[in-house]
């Protein structure tokens, strides 16, 4: 009986947190996180203020939990796909990343949007940068002075891709998006090295 009650409570807590997350994502489309009040959020999702305070001390606390959970899922994707040159681990990592974003599409879209959290965007950048440095080094063993520019190009391209997909790509599956992003990165790598070597021959 006690275990059953616990499961029921857990389910209710999950439902409440999910409603708050959705409500926050919707409000963040209109205004910055600093302007959103607890009253506004609980009214939007039809939950008591006391229920909100049972789980969070304030709006930034709620946002921090949401961001941390997403980051943990992305970190897990990184751990599960260590770089293995010659294998498609990079592709599977990208696919997992898109799955995490897809499962959190509303809030992820709000976070990278105009009223989003620049701190979250930076964390996402760091995560992608670590992985892209690792994967590019695996794809292209020699280090050159141009690599930092190439990292920057790939990183910003990936971030732009993610933003566009979150905002407009509801009908495109994470697999489809991952395939497309992967093709773009690989073709950039290939083109970068082909033209570089081509020029040196002339």
Language model: regions and residue ranges:
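Terminal, non-globular segments
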Residues: 74, 78, 128, 132-135, ...
């Amino acid at each position: 009986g006690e275990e059953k009650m616990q499961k029921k409570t857990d389910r209710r807590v999950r439902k409440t947190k999910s409603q708050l997350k959705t409500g926050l994502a919707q409000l963040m489309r209109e205004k910055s996180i600093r302007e959103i009040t607890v009253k506004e959020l609980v009214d939007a999702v039809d939950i008591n203020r006391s229920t909100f305070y049972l789980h969070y001390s304030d709006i930034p606390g709620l946002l921090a939990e949401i961001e941390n959970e997403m980051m943990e899922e992305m970190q897990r994707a990184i751990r599960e796909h260590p770089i293995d040159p010659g294998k498609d681990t990079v592709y599977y990592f990208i696919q997992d990343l898109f799955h995490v974003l897809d499962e959190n599409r509303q809030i992820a879209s709000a976070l990278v949007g105009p009223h989003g959290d620049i701190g979250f965007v930076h964390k996402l950048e760091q995560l992608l940068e670590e992985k892209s440095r690792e994967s590019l080094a695996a794809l292209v063993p020699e280090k050159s002075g141009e690599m930092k520019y190439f990292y920057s190009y790939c990183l910003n391209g990936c971030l732009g891709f993610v933003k566009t997909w979150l905002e407009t790509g509801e009908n495109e599956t994470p697999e489809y998006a991952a395939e497309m992003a992967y093709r773009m990165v690989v073709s950039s790598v290939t083109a970068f090295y082909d033209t570089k070597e081509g020029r040196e021959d002339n």
